[in-house]
A protein has these predicted regions:
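Short, glycine/serine-rich, charged loops/turns that create anion-binding
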Residues: 11, 36, 102
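A generic structural signal for alpha->beta connector loops
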Residues: 26-28, 42, 92
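Active-site regions of enzymes building and remodeling cell-envelope glycoconjugates
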Residues: 41-49
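N-terminal Rossmann NAD(P)H-binding glycine-rich loop of SDR-like oxidoreductase domains
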Residues: 2-27, 33
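Short glycine-/acidic-enriched loop or helix-start segments at secondary-structure transitions
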Residues: 16-18, 41, 77-78, 106-107
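NAD(P)-cofactor binding segment of oxidoreductase domains
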Residues: 44, 53, 61-104
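N-terminal Rossmann-fold cofactor-binding loop
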Residues: 31-37, 49-50
Length: 108
């Protein structure tokens, strides 16, 4: 069996599609989320916060690949930095950073 894949932002707009595709392909999927969730549909959920670094280390442990889909209006560089550090310490072999283009808010 292939190594575990961790998806950050796996409950968001982009991430939930990534999780679905990986799960359908038979991958061992773990999701890092700020809110606790029960495991379901072959997906393990772990609670953590990329901004504070809390819970990242246990989430990346055992993941050979990390797909980073988490994004927000601010603080993305620090969040990515926290994830990269934890991934490096855990020996993750691959880190994929996905994002989506945001449309400017028409009222701003």
């Amino acid at each position: 069996m292939a190594s575990r894949i961790l998806v950050t932002g796996g409950t968001g707009t982009l991430g939930r599609h990534v999780v679905s595709r990986l799960r359908d392909a038979g991958c061992d999927v773990r999701v890092l989320s700020r809110r606790s969730r029960a495991p379901g549909d072959g997906v393990e959920f772990m609670t953590g916060d990329l901004a504070t670094g809390e819970g990242i280390e246990p989430a990346v442990e055992g993941a050979g690949t990390i797909v980073h889909c988490a994004g927000s209006a601010k603080g993305d560089e620090d969040k990515a930095r926290n994830l990269v550090r934890a991934a490096s310490r855990a020996g993750a072999r691959h880190l994929v950073h996905l994002g989506r283009r945001r449309r400017p808010h028409p009222d701003r």
